[in-house]
């Protein structure tokens, strides 16, 4: 059975986008979409714990981490479930998102439905930095835009 989800990203500034998620059975989740209004370069891209948007993207809480692991890159064994690495924006400020991830899911224990997708100000160092913040957030900086992930047709 195929499941689909969608997330509309919005923030205080010009950054916005739409992200689509598709999962067939227990296979990997295919994440695709477009984010506009970014500065050129890499930006951290994570699923955060909560659906709470009462204080903008800040109230989305930490990265989705049901396994209580340290922050890492999407290909690492040691990573939060919500660690999807970086998206890269060109000179035009547009990032084309194309990710396939086997840890997130659209149902079950690692379901991202009802959680918040966040795009960050800076590059995610994938937990390879030399400070404590690297093992928690990847030093990705402030939250530029976010949106709740919901079930789609």
Curated annotation (Swiss-Prot):
One of its GO terms (molecular function) is superoxide dismutase activity. It is found in: Cytoplasm; Nucleus. Palmitoylation helps nuclear targeting and decreases catalytic activity. It is an enzyme of class 1 (oxidoreductase). The modification N6-acetyllysine is found at residue 122. A lipid is attached at residue 7 (S-palmitoyl cysteine). The keyword Lipoprotein applies. CDD domains: Cu-Zn_Superoxide_Dismutase. Pfam families: Sod_Cu. Coiled coil: none annotated. Its cofactor is Cu cation; Zn(2+). Disulfide bonds join 57-146. SUPFAM superfamilies: Cu,Zn superoxide dismutase-like. The modification N6-succinyllysine is found at residues 4, 10, 91, 122. Keywords: Acetylation, Antioxidant, Copper, Cytoplasm, Disulfide bond, Lipoprotein, Metal-binding, Nucleus, Oxidoreductase, Palmitate, Phosphoprotein, Zinc. Zn(2+) binds at residues 63, 71, 80, 83. Cu cation binds at residues 46, 48, 63, 120. The modification Phosphoserine is found at residues 98, 102, 107. Homodimer; non-disulfide-linked. Heterodimer with SOD1. The heterodimer CCS:SOD1 interacts with SLC31A1; this heterotrimer is Cu(1+)-mediated and its maintenance is regulated through SOD1 activation. Belongs to the Cu-Zn superoxide dismutase family. Destroys radicals which are normally produced within the cells and which are toxic to biological systems. This is Superoxide dismutase [Cu-Zn]. It comes from Canis lupus familiaris (Dog). The gene is SOD1.
